[in-house]
């Protein structure tokens, strides 16, 4: 059975209160593609690794898509009305401004594919930690990996330069 069209503007107005930290992300459809509306602000320091492409459409406000491009950290600004297709396997960290709203479309993962979360040292860009996992639910599969990284001084300490990667305030207690 076909799903009726969604009035995206009406959906955003009805759910705007959910598009805020700490998650700021709501899946509106999932059938072959994962279609999400994402609100800002956010303060992500992780990089997402997806074996498929991701399509970004900035509806309101601005965002910066931080990417790791062949070992170099780079910023890609995406403004309201702009779209950007991120190629597969490019680690990326969406940084969304307060009040911003974006639409992100990813294809559902193939059975043999894994998603990843990576962290890089903000001082020297050395990869600190990477976790790969089969993605089942984008809203619930990420938080345990965030918890593991942010609660560990060992994982957050750069082996190259010794810098301690900062953790969000909600991770005030660490397990190491």
Curated annotation (Swiss-Prot):
Binding of O2, residues: 44
Binding site for substrate: 54, 96, 106
Protein name: 3-hydroxyanthranilate 3,4-dioxygenase
The record's free-text note on cofactor binding: Binds 2 Fe(2+) ions per subunit.
Pathway: Cofactor biosynthesis; NAD(+) biosynthesis; quinolinate from L-kynurenine: step 3/3
Catalytic activity: 3-hydroxyanthranilate + O2 = (2Z,4Z)-2-amino-3-carboxymuconate 6-semialdehyde
A Pfam match: 3-HAO
Cofactor(s) essential for the protein: Fe(2+)
Coiled coil: none
Binding positions for Fe cation 2 per the UniProt entry: 121, 124, 158, 161
Residues annotated as binding Fe cation 1: 48, 54, 92
UniProt superkingdom: Bacteria
Gene Ontology BP annotations: anthranilate metabolic process; L-tryptophan catabolic process; NAD biosynthetic process; quinolinate biosynthetic process
GO molecular function (one): 3-hydroxyanthranilate 3,4-dioxygenase activity
UniProt keyword annotation of Ubl conjugation present: no
The protein's Enzyme Commission number: 1.13.11.6
Function: Catalyzes the oxidative ring opening of 3-hydroxyanthranilate to 2-amino-3-carboxymuconate semialdehyde, which spontaneously cyclizes to quinolinate.
SUBUNIT field: Homodimer.
Family statement drawn from the similarity comment of this UniProt entry: Belongs to the 3-HAO family.
Entry keywords, A to Z: Dioxygenase, Iron, Metal-binding, Oxidoreductase, Pyridine nucleotide biosynthesis
InterPro entries referenced in this protein's UniProt entry, alphabetically: 3hydroanth_dOase, RmlC-like_jellyroll, RmlC_Cupin_sf
Enzyme class (EC, first level): oxidoreductase
Gene3D superfamilies: Jelly Rolls
